[in-house]
């Protein structure tokens, strides 16, 4: 959970920016988007293997 205390003589917009930055650091928005919809295990496995293949292609390109 992210807490941001508004400092004395600080504008609300600045505190909101700090809050957004902290949320981004902690990966809260990414987690919310990930949990938004149900993904069956078969689809998770498929995506995971596709990402692995993509990584392998990138490393092959970098080696040559």
Swiss-Prot record:
Residues 55-64 have a biased composition (Basic residues). Keywords: Ribonucleoprotein, Ribosomal protein. Residues 40-64 are annotated as: Disordered. GO terms for molecular function: structural constituent of ribosome. GO terms for cellular component: ribonucleoprotein complex; ribosome. It comes from the Bacteria. GO terms for biological process: translation. Disulfide bonds: none annotated. Belongs to the bacterial ribosomal protein bS21 family. NCBIfam families: S21p. This is Small ribosomal subunit protein bS21. It comes from Elusimicrobium minutum (strain Pei191). The gene is rpsU.
């Amino acid at each position: 959970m992210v807490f941001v205390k508004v400092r004395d003589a600080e504008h609300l917009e600045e505190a909101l920016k700090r809050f957004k930055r902290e949320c981004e650091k902690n990966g809260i928005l990414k987690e919310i988007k990930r949990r938004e919809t149900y993904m069956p295990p078969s689809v998770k496995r498929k995506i995971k293997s596709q990402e692995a293949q993509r990584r392998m292609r990138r490393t092959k390109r970098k080696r040559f």
